């Protein structure tokens, strides 16, 4: 494939910003350390300005504040260099559009609705009464069971599975190995065994949701598990049944959200977080990696962290410095206790 080429003026014409220096052509985005003359790079943090001077990049995306001192360099000045870099990267890696057609080995049930603009890959399966929007890509070995509804331009990567009755909004992307709508973990104890509670809800994903590889979102017990517009969920995340996740929230890998948890919009949840069930997490909450969330977070905008039971980030940082000194502090405490005990004996 011939690489795309853009001049700096073409980039700023599409994305805004101001180019300075020569109007050179670039073919890809690269890190400062690896970039060559045909590449464009970026400086997100001004404390790394020295790396710009050492870089062979043909052009660099910088903020207006950081642009001083780079005379002679080809620059694009942008309000948010990191966001601008992401948009430039998209120019060089455009979204793949569906090539209309159904592979001969795919199985599409007669009652399914599959527009001619959809791409159905080898050994893929589309169940009865399922309706696909325009331009969907259901790739090799992916499965959409019966009675599902998919919006326009949904992408299911190889071996992704959507169980029956689920609804996916426009431009949803499900990566390989992810399972949407498997049974929730609902059981009732029957005295000597566990009785499985039928999971009669489904899963509803809003527009522009992205689900990472090998992530599971369980169907609701009676009503749907829901994920709001623009939310991004990383690989190997478990979302329990009946969860309600707001819009534009991000959840990193290895996190487990127990059943019936409500998470607000614009939250940031780090990797390896675990929650108890039936709690609420307010909008714009940030939870650091590895945190155990044991109770509801009712105040919006909190930043929480801790391997131990959850605390504010400030409290956790203040206490964390003592973790490696606990043994030493314990010995000192025992010594002081002994000295106090001895002093008490001597005074008698």
Curated annotation (Swiss-Prot):
Catalytic site positions: 241 (proton acceptor)
GO molecular function: N-acyltransferase activity
Keyword Lipid biosynthesis recorded: yes
Catalytic reactions of this protein: a UDP-3-O-[(3R)-3-hydroxyacyl]-alpha-D-glucosamine + a (3R)-hydroxyacyl-[ACP] = a UDP-2-N,3-O-bis[(3R)-3-hydroxyacyl]-alpha-D-glucosamine + holo-[ACP] + H(+)
PROSITE patterns assigned to the protein according to its UniProt record, in alphabetical order: HEXAPEP_TRANSFERASES
EC number: 2.3.1.191
Pathway: Bacterial outer membrane biogenesis; LPS lipid A biosynthesis
One annotated GO biological process: lipid A biosynthetic process
UniProt keywords, alphabetically: Acyltransferase, Lipid A biosynthesis, Lipid biosynthesis, Lipid metabolism, Repeat, Transferase
Pfam families in alphabetical order: Hexapep (PF00132), LpxD (PF04613)
GO CC field: membrane
Subunit structure: Homotrimer.
Stated family: Belongs to the transferase hexapeptide repeat family. LpxD subfamily.
PANTHER family, per database record: UDP-3-O-ACYLGLUCOSAMINE N-ACYLTRANSFERASE, UDP-3-O-ACYLGLUCOSAMINE N-ACYLTRANSFERASE 1, MITOCHONDRIAL-RELATED
Function: Catalyzes the N-acylation of UDP-3-O-acylglucosamine using 3-hydroxyacyl-ACP as the acyl donor. Is involved in the biosynthesis of lipid A, a phosphorylated glycolipid that anchors the lipopolysaccharide to the outer membrane of the cell.
Listed name of the protein: UDP-3-O-acylglucosamine N-acyltransferase
Organism lineage string: Bacteria, Pseudomonadati, Pseudomonadota, Betaproteobacteria, Neisseriales
Gene: lpxD
